[in-house]
Amino acid sequence: MRGFILDFFNYFVFFYTSTLATCFILFAFLSFISLKRRKSYYVESYIRKTIKESPYTPGVSVIAPAYNEEKTIIDNVSSMLALEYPVFEVIIVNDGSTDKTLEKMVKHFDLVEVPFAYIERIKTKPFRRLFKSTNPEYKRLILVDKENGGTKADASNAGINVASYPYFICTDVDCILEKYALHRCILPVISSEKQLAADRLCTG
């Protein structure tokens, strides 16, 4: 009986200490994850604040080709205009759509044709016209109308030709960009100590 009690006590102590050690390890791991997330949150908050307030933050042009996107074009463009970044423009390139993509954009975003000296730095299918909004709410929006080039690259190149800012992001018009996507894209540029060889950055 005495031996049984001793064995039971030994097993109890073993399992108790093992459980306690496991709990300590688990708590330490969870604390590490929590601290890492909190650090990441504060770092990102600092980055966003710095980018927002710095007078040296570079402008970014978001370029998106659109071909026969009448069903979703309004929602997709509105999503792009809602991005958080201090200096950016959204360039939608209507690549010779045969539906009402152009008409819907013109009506919804109060767009009017404006004179524009198109400089073909990159060769594309012929440029037709350029639209801007009369509504201050959509002041960042530019609509380029061109002949269909057969590829998204041709439409993107037309957008690059009219871009106002030194960096650009080429994406699809139906892609949903995360709210702070431009911050993440431009961070490597402003934090790099090396001078960039090119004057433009393109990520797709």
Which residues does each PLM region occupy?
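Short aromatic/hydrophobic "clamp" motif used to bind/position activated sugar donors
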Residues: 168
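Conserved donor NDP-sugar-binding/catalytic core segment of glycosyltransferases
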Residues: 180-204
